[in-house]
């Protein structure tokens, strides 16, 4: 990923970023708004380590934390992670772990070609327009 936060942003350990987090630089706000901070992960898609669409991978610290706080959160780790997903186009950075899980599980259990086309088009619109997620 591209760096969107100031250096030493996590000097006190991993922290979940808020939408208006003061650790996010001005350039970081732009790359997050357009989601281009995710583009380096296209390499992971080409290598087969990620898919284009699927639940976004979380850092191990957050998976452990959220799995202990949100029943079923670890289930989203059972599928190949994706560069973009239903949770990202429905709420992006504003979602709580519970909300993210709801969208990820909907994609995992009810995903279809039409849903993938919808996610792809919405993702492209976010990148082109910079209009976040909703």
Predicted regions span which residues?
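Conserved small/aromatic sequence motifs within transmembrane helices
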Residues: 1-134
